[in-house]
């Protein structure tokens, strides 16, 4: 068994090897001419038949799923189902599920290692999560319980399968839902083997298999032993990856169903026994299990994640959006025929001026209501639906290609720097600093606030001078490259090499795309 004690394993160095890791949110599929011809032929002859048969099997699952829970009360469903329902329906769903994946082209599921019993490991954690085909891992795990969105209950067949599974459901619209999910996971995980195992995809979203995203702590809150489960698709062509940017659902399904044979490897690693410290700290526990799995996979463990609907990467100590919303604003304004350079700023340095959507449209000379609403939504609004025009002025300045980076950073400082007392020097405090980084880089405000505290010299005022701010944004070996890459919206999608890969001695190891290896914790 893997232990949480020091010396149990060595952290993976993502910079070792011949090349750095590519961006985990982007999947590019390059087909040769011969491959294109093959996919065209098989896509017409093979894929439609496979998909049709798979959908027929999917609907055949419904009677078994319905029968297992038919007539049971909510109180009865709070306990694991046993007896004939469990035997007949469980085996029926298991067999039909294997047939479904077989029809989609997954002719072989190769299993390595030994699945632990529910007493040894009440929780299974599977990674990397790269595709909607990943539920295939449920088959060698004997259909463990899963965690899913409550909204999926309304999806035909899928909802019935979730009820059959007695899945733990979380609602995005109910703030108390997450607390109930945590309590339910803890209840099942500490039931002494009464409940089947619970399987998590701790990354929470799909990547391209090239790096592990940051693990969410939900699977580790109970503090019980977990068994890591690795998922690999060792096929000559990666048609299964479904990343934030790359082939969509239908294309991934069509390409995979057009392959003569797809293979999936499922590997059970030794059970990870948490230390006392890890059992009390789910984040530490999650980070250490993530690095164990990354080492076994031979890929880096990163702190990349989704914040809301945006993918976030890490550069040094700062989290930044992979593509700041500022770039999307540029597309909206360009489509409306607006040139940011001719807009009269009218923003007063150091003082906020809150404006309504109507005033925003008048200031930017926009007439189309849809364009106005779309552009206005990019800025943070207060309780009255107003935005600070300083944010608008800085965004327009950043989109004005006629300004140098030095002029732009000076303007940012002038707009948000404040005087503590009459006649004192104007300094950039944490609120203004976090606003600038959030607007220009898409950085979450808490991360920017933490970085601001580190940049301020100990014993001095908790603010940055213009010189200090420009040294940070223009001349810092790491963050200066970040600003130069982000402060101009691209005419075409940037390659990942344009995001800085330098690292400072005090920062975690940075990758070519700006991601970092998870900071070393106990056990390094």
Swiss-Prot record:
Residues 495-518 have a biased composition (Polar residues). Displays acyl-CoA-dependent lysophospholipid acyltransferase activity with a subset of lysophospholipids as substrates; converts lysophosphatidylethanolamine to phosphatidylethanolamine, 1-alkenyl-lysophatidylethanolamine to 1-alkenyl-phosphatidylethanolamine, lysophosphatidylglycerol and alkyl-lysophosphatidylcholine to phosphatidylglycerol and alkyl-phosphatidylcholine, respectively. In contrast, has no lysophosphatidylinositol, glycerol-3-phosphate, diacylglycerol or lysophosphatidic acid acyltransferase activity. Prefers long chain acyl-CoAs (C16, C18) as acyl donors. GO terms for biological process: phosphatidylcholine acyl-chain remodeling; phosphatidylethanolamine acyl-chain remodeling; phosphatidylserine acyl-chain remodeling; phospholipid biosynthetic process; phospholipid metabolic process. This is Lysophospholipid acyltransferase LPCAT4. It is found in: Endoplasmic reticulum membrane. Its main location: endoplasmic reticulum. Glycans are attached at residue 152. Keywords: Acyltransferase, Endoplasmic reticulum, Glycoprotein, Lipid biosynthesis, Lipid metabolism, Membrane, Phospholipid biosynthesis, Phospholipid metabolism, Transferase, Transmembrane, Transmembrane helix. It comes from Mus musculus. The keyword Lipid biosynthesis applies.
